[in-house]
Amino acid sequence: MDAPRNAAPGEFAAVMDFIDQVFRPGQTGTRIMHGQYPHLYRPDAEHMGRSLVLYDAGTLVGHLAVHPVGLRLGGVTVWAGGVGGVAAHPDRRGEGIMTALLAASETHMRALGFPLSILGGDRQRYGWCGWENGGRRTTFALTPRSLGRATAADLALPLRRLRWDAATRRRIWALERQRPYGAERSLDDLRYRFERTSREAWECRDAGRFAYVVLGGPAHQAHPYERLDEFGGDPALVLAMVRQLMAQHEVTSLRAVVGPHGPDLALLRPVASSWHVEADGMVRILDLATLVAQLAPVLRRRHRRLRESGSIEFGMADSGQRAILRLGPGSVRRVRLSDRDMVTLFFGLHPAGEVFAGRPAARLDGMLPLPLFVPPLDHV
């Protein structure tokens, strides 16, 4: 078996066929994943270089991609290696292919300078090599009863599929950037997140107001609508658009996923039949010192609430990493945790005072954790 290596542009068709075989065996068509994730998979050298491929006797048997994801974390941006498309040939599972690819991806991400890695996957599958549940998202259930049935005024609104002129692109980009926690998007790539086979984006312009919504269906298909993956613009117009689309498409329930953004939560809580809060994905700390240095402005600002001085020395027991956050004169407090518990301290779902009660890390409650969130349109 060959060692994992970066894919070349000429391998685009082979890579797309392979990951379709692994991830979309029941769906018809060609280059299915390319259509569902056009912002990730493209035949140019830059995007193909993100894929690690593993061959055995000339046959592609494994794939893993590392995509750069800029995480907005309350005023700073930390770039993470977003791991996706982890695939072993169905007939070759249990041969160590995934293990080899994950090890190669770690080397690759460290070489690129990513202090973090993120992925979506099973905790038992990925936890053994350092990833842990992290981040925070709220999923709201919207029904015609909770949201209110579409009125004549709602049904009269001029909805249309989102158009991609330069002004609309800049407007949507600016609206999303108002959220303090999320993922960085470039203007050049923005369109690829919205125009994909797995979702449909709608806009409405009415009496000087503007709003957009993005909906999707099951199994990475656009229909039937079951998810509200993103929205922005005039709040009342957003809800009216959702009511119209639910009525026209006979939708009885929508799941709406949002991050830790007050206006989004305030908009959906009153019109939801229920909601639940859960970890947003899995996180691994690759470089603790770089992470602490990049987060320092936010951590110092949040630390002022604790009314304490001195410095904090973070230590990761498994990997032996250390980092110091200097907060002023005074003693050094040492917080030593396992690698996965350090993820929980920095990005976990629950307050540090609850998870680490009776331990030094509990004193950082209020400064940590940070509510990391990757919007659905930015998943890898």
Model features per residue range: what roles?
Residues 1-68, 75-78, 82, 147-188, ...:
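Short amphipathic alpha-helix that is part of the acyltransferase structural core
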Residues 54, 66, 88, 204, ...:
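GNAT/GCN5-related N-acetyltransferase fold signature
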Residues 55-59, 205-210, 359:
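A glycine-centered beta-loop-beta connector
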Residues 85-88, 94-107, 233-247:
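Conserved acetyl-CoA-binding loop-helix of GNAT-fold acetyltransferases
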Residues 102, 107-121, 249-260:
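Conserved GNAT acetyl-CoA-binding A-motif
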Residues 132-149, 232-236, 240-380:
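Active-site/acyl-donor-binding loops of N-acyltransferases
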Residues 136-238, 243-244, 256, 289-308:
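Amide-forming acyltransferase catalytic core, primarily the GNAT-like/NAT-type
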